[in-house]
Amino acid sequence: MPKISELLTKHFRLAPVRPDMVSDNWIRWSRDPVLMAQLNARATQPTRADIQRYVVASWKSKRMIVGIYARTNGEHIGIYEATIDPRHGNVRLDMLVDPQSYTLSRVLPETDPALLQFFAQEHRIEKAVAVVVETHIPLISHLETTGWLKEGVLRQEHAAVTGNRRLDAVQFGRLLVAEK
């Protein structure tokens, strides 16, 4: 499987996250109850070693973790997690951008095209899919306004991490075309 070394956009650098690259920001994101609630995840108190083990396990299971870094100062500002299904020619993406540093609407319109083009060219991926829990309003808004097709709503797909209810998930898809 071809590996991503680095993708550069005007303002950002995308690069695979190795265990030694786990940032203080990533640790902070995991501990932020407001950010984690948007993702329907519990805020935890992970150590650097915990996240490093997660990175190793992800790469072993063929899930790519791609960091988003500011080109000006190298700050780690977000993450893409990508699970490639070569048999069906698709990739499932999860995205996180640090709301204290940047907004999704500033970062993803610039980084999405570069990463999606990489998948189309290097992995022959034809379709990207993102399944977003209903509480992540900023990501849903981004996907709706940047050419992703809302394919459906999965009713009561996820148990809420807080409270006693279930949450809907919205599935988005985007067909990719490899430029020659």
List the predicted regions and their residue ranges.
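Structured interaction and signal-relay segments at domain junctions
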Residues: 29
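Hydrophobic pocket/interface hotspot
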Residues: 25-26, 35, 51, 93
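Acyl-donor (CoA/ACP) binding surface of acyl/acetyltransferases
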Residues: 1-22, 32, 72-180
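A short helix-loop-beta-strand connector motif used in the catalytic cores of GNAT acetyltransferases and
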Residues: 55-67, 78
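Generic structural signal for secondary-structure transition and capping sites
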Residues: 34-35, 63-64, 124
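Short, contiguous strand/loop micro-motifs
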Residues: 38-42, 58, 102-103, 126-127
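Conserved GNAT-fold acetyl-CoA-binding loop/helix
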Residues: 34-53
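A generic secondary-structure signal
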Residues: 53-57, 118-119
